Amino acid sequence: MRLGKDGKVELIKRVPLFSKLSKKGLEEVAHIADELDLPKGKVMAVEGDRGREFFVLLEGEADVTKGDRSINTMKEGDFFGEIALVTKMPRTASVTATTPVRVLVITERDFGALIKHSDEVGRGVAEALAERIAPELPV
């Protein structure tokens, strides 16, 4: 069953990158999020590649690997790629569907256009990123 706008908003607001957004900002992000059905075995992220999309797992499971070692199993509600979407840093792990999956996807292009169009989304994402990296900065 496909998510409606409210379902997308509920998932997106759990993502730390979007935690500072108002309901309107969350709705703007939900508007650019696409639902995709992907087959078992589909590689959604490759370690070392530059991330160009952000994923929320809606149904199914995916294996997270670093090198040839499995480090985690992702399930419904888990997400990945949000930092790569903004920072353009390489992926730190690979993610492969171990069952057929349904995902919510936000592409770099759509997200970039939204940030240019929406001051609130741009500010909210910048604030959330600053809070995330501040503890790692030397004092």
Feature map (PLM): residue ranges:
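Cytosolic regulatory regions built on CNB/CRP/Popeye-like sensor folds
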Residues: 1-139
